[in-house]
Design a protein with these regions (language model features):
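Metallo-beta-lactamase
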Residues: 2-3, 96-187
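Active-site HxH/HxHxD metal-binding segment of metal-dependent hydrolases
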Residues: 2-92
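C-terminal regulatory/interaction regions
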Residues: 193-196
C-alpha cells in the first residue's frame, strides 16, 4: 500500500501510453492488491477482477472478512467489477490466459497460465525458493494438502517461465518445485516449523 505511487508510475511506463484495461488479482493480501485503489484512480475505467468468494467482501468492503483488520494489514478500499473464475480463459495483453485455482497460501488464490509462451503468474503459490506462508494453517485449518495439489497443478502445466508474486522471474521450474515440495514435507512433518 505504501508503494502506490511507484506502482502507478511503473504501470504507466509499461503501458507506453496505452490504457490500463484490467486488474486481475491472484488473491487479496494487501501486498498484492494494495495498489488497486491508486490504479483505479489513475485509470477510472479499469475493470478489476478478484477471485471467487471475495467479490461480495470487496463490494461491501469488509476488512474483517478480507483479513485486513485481524492481521494488521492496511489496504485502501477499491472496487471489484467481476470475478476471475478458475477454469476460465481471460484475454489480457492480446494473449489468452488460463485461470487455475491455487489454494494453499490463501484459499481463494488463483494462478494464470499463458500456454503459447508457457508463462505462469504464480503469485505466492510458487517462488523460486518455496512458496508463501500457508495462512489457513496458522488459523487452525488444514491446508498443506491444498498446497501439494497446487504444486501438482503447476507441474502439470509445465511452465517454462514463472513470474512469482515475490522475487525475480525464473525458468528452473523443476528446481523450484523440488524446493517447494521439500519445504512442504518439512512443514507436514513438523507443523510448528511453519508457525515460526
Amino acid at each position: 500500500c505504501t508503494e502506490a505511487a511507484a506502482t502507478v508510475q511503473g504501470v504507466r511506463q509499461a503501458l507506453q501510453g496505452q490504457t490500463l484495461a484490467h486488474i486481475v488479482n491472484t488473491h487479496l493480501h494487501s501486498d498484492h492488491c494494495g495498489g488497486n485503489a491508486a490504479l483505479q484512480a489513475a485509470w477510472p475505467q479499469v475493470q478489476t477482477w478478484v477471485a471467487p468468494g471475495q467479490l461480495a467482501l470487496v463490494q461491501a468492503w469488509d476488512p474483517v472478512g478480507l483479513s485486513y483488520a485481524p492481521t494488521g494489514q492496511r489496504c485502501p478500499q477499491f472496487r471489484a467489477d467481476g470475478v476471475v473464475q478458475p477454469g476460465a480463459t481471460v484475454q489480457l495483453g492480446l494473449r489468452d490466459w488460463q485461470v487455475h485455482a491455487a489454494p494453499g497460501h490463501d484459499p481463494h488464490s488463483v494462478v494464470l497460465f499463458e500456454p503459447q509462451r508457457r508463462l505462469l503468474i504464480s503469485a505466492d503459490a510458487l517462488w523460486e525458493r518455496g512458496f508463501g506462508v500457508v495462512f489457513p494453517e496458522l488459523e487452525g485449518e488444514q491446508a498443506f494438502a491444498e498446497v501439494e495439489a497446487t504444486l501438482d497443478v503447476i507441474e502439470q502445466l509445465q511452465p517454462e517461465w514463472v513470474l512469482p508474486g515475490h522475487g525475480s522471474m525464473f525458468s528452473d521450474v523443476a528446481g523450484a518445485l523440488a524446493v517447494a515440495r521439500k519445504r512442504l514435507a518439512d512443514f507436514q512433518a513438523d507443523p510448528q516449523r511453519h508457525a515460526q
